[in-house]
């Protein structure tokens, strides 16, 4: 059972917490992580790319010259794909790139991502995180105290907290998530994984 230190907002160790083996201590499955990240990025694609075919390009309705007798190659339209300003053959059209992956695979990938953060000592547990007012400087000081102010980090909260969310919004390299919006791509993409103690309890409740 992985055991990690619990920090306060001043960066001091105030205790320890035991994390569940079946969530934070599994063997990392890199293939599952890769599959889920590819799926996430594919689902984010707009799919609005488009090209015009020969029939959609303006002009080219008349045969440029007669079929025989000119000595030149035969052509039926100046908008064929081989012509300058011609249509595109087999070009991209608007489409959806979305596809689904099995729920078990998503869960395995998420647990693998969390376990990798524990293995690499990149997971930090905060005792609590609450601000009386919206203040970016307060959040910046917390990151500085935790020694993660010069790297990228994802912050996971148990529930919505407006003051914390807005205080973190303008800090470069910091992304705020909640237990229900936690995802493999953001966990892997950021160097550090910061999570509050009550969020750990919620993660273990949801993914046990």
From Swiss-Prot:
Q: Which Gene3D superfamilies match?
A: 3.40.1370.10
Q: Which InterPro entries match?
A: Ribosomal_uL4, Ribosomal_uL4-like, Ribosomal_uL4_dom_sf
* Superkingdom of origin organism: Bacteria
Molecular function as annotated in GO:
rRNA binding; structural constituent of ribosome
For whether the record's keyword set contains Ribosomal protein, the answer is yes
One GO CC term of this entry?
A: ribonucleoprotein complex
This protein's UniProt keywords:
Ribonucleoprotein, Ribosomal protein, RNA-binding, rRNA-binding
Composition skew (Basic residues), residue ranges? 60-76
> A biological process (GO) annotation for this entry?
translation
Disordered: annotated segments? 44-76
**Annotated Pfam families:** Ribosomal_L4
- Sum up the protein's function in the record's words: One of the primary rRNA binding proteins, this protein initially binds near the 5'-end of the 23S rRNA. It is important during the early stages of 50S assembly. It makes multiple contacts with different domains of the 23S rRNA in the assembled 50S subunit and ribosome. Forms part of the polypeptide exit tunnel.
Recorded family membership? Belongs to the universal ribosomal protein uL4 family.
Describe its partners and assembly state.
Part of the 50S ribosomal subunit.
Q: Which PANTHER family match?
A: 50S RIBOSOMAL PROTEIN L4, LARGE RIBOSOMAL SUBUNIT PROTEIN UL4M
Protein name from the UniProt record: Large ribosomal subunit protein uL4
Native source species: Acetivibrio thermocellus (strain ATCC 27405 / DSM 1237 / JCM 9322 / NBRC 103400 / NCIMB 10682 / NRRL B-4536 / VPI 7372) (Clostridium thermocellum)
